[in-house]
């Protein structure tokens, strides 16, 4: 089966969020299952540098000007790059300028991505033509609309990685996009008077997926639907909405083989994990104390991630004898609050603003608990990394967090299914209660190690998701 993924990021070459991790792993897993998989992306500078050897497929005139389609390979996967320097050759983020303002021509930049993907489905590359086009998030949403406008030359799947980002643009741009005027309506890509690239994907795709089963249910409710819940409820009735859990790339995230760690370890050698803890305490200026559990945050610092709750719960966490490590950037108010906490609690709280992939590995390996108290979480990867590394996740019961972490309640400890700590209400006191339960288990090292070993043996590999997606493609 020939599959084309349409997206804007690819780990490790270009990453702003979890989408890049998915595209860096899912196509390779599908290839291993026998599929013929390729990816199409804009030729952003980081991607051009990472894939320097390409051949010209075609040069064509488009509504966005003269464009070259180039083809190369990265880690065994065929990659199409859309070479349009005026649109894509910009330093920094693929989405906004240095002042964090979204590029004013994003509507054109990402419409071209969808249009070129559709052209491939129509035979632009005389040597390869996809049977299934799989578009990811709003950046690729117009792909499904272009395919519908061209009579659906390939089947289409649209994956929502985060419904909060809707790709909204002025309706004045519609005439530039080479889409039928009748597509701009409530049964189409119109959303409260604007064009929504996300809605285009939801409405025109043959099938829609989200990145966890629980998130697929949540987004049909007003609290999580961002105004799209009516359309999503219709997709459920039509049997066109499925939740497929993201996975972990074990080539990158495995404590047995992770070369970024001071010391590698596995479920049978947890003593070596303690060496990583000592290194982390030293690196973050924390008191060297093996008996103090380290709670870690590796995240964008936003209210969506529930990190205001962590700040509220911090006095209790420290009073109980814990330490806190934070790696991330985002909301200026949260950044300043965490830095102030580190200054006030020197030796017990360590904060590094920014994101460093290598250091994130060392934090997850060296910590005892990974905090993911999100208000909503489509899937979440951090808790999966925690499980893999024996760093027990403490999460709120939402989205993919609910699908992947089993609470250390007595009955789950008894039957051996417990893998972390789960709380329900989105409030600081609920988080505090979960932290207290973590300390209770911490006080019983034998039970803690038992849960650690179980967590590390859980299989959240990409092969499971790859099989599920290929099965879905065949049903279309």
UniProtKB/Swiss-Prot annotation:
Q: Which Gene3D superfamilies match?
A: Glycogen Phosphorylase B
Pathway listed: Glycan biosynthesis; glycogen biosynthesis
Q: Which positions are annotated as binding ADP-alpha-D-glucose?
A: 15
What PANTHER family does the database record attribute to this sequence?
Answer: ALPHA AMYLASE DOMAIN-CONTAINING PROTEIN, GRANULE-BOUND STARCH SYNTHASE 1, CHLOROPLASTIC/AMYLOPLASTIC
Record field: catalytic activity: [(1->4)-alpha-D-glucosyl](n) + ADP-alpha-D-glucose = [(1->4)-alpha-D-glucosyl](n+1) + ADP + H(+)
Answer yes or no on keyword Transferase: yes
Keywords annotated in UniProt? Glycogen biosynthesis, Glycosyltransferase, Transferase
Does Electron transport show up as a keyword for this record?
Answer: no
Spell out the protein name for this chain: Glycogen synthase
EC numbers, comma separated:
2.4.1.21
Which species does this protein come from?
Yersinia pseudotuberculosis serotype IB (strain PB1/+)
- InterPro entries with a match to the protein in the record: Glyco_trans_1 (IPR001296), GS/SS (IPR011835), Starch_synth_cat_dom (IPR013534)
NCBIfam families referenced in this protein's UniProt entry, alphabetically:
glgA, PRK00654.1-2
Single Gene Ontology MF annotation: alpha-1,4-glucan glucosyltransferase (UDP-glucose donor) activity
Record function comment: Synthesizes alpha-1,4-glucan chains using ADP-glucose.
Q: Which GO terms describe its biological process?
A: glycogen biosynthetic process
Instruction: Read off the CDD domains from this record.
Output: GT5_Glycogen_synthase_DULL1-like
Identify the GO cellular component terms for this protein.
cytosol
Q: Which family does it belong to?
A: Belongs to the glycosyltransferase 1 family. Bacterial/plant glycogen synthase subfamily.
EC class of this enzyme?
transferase
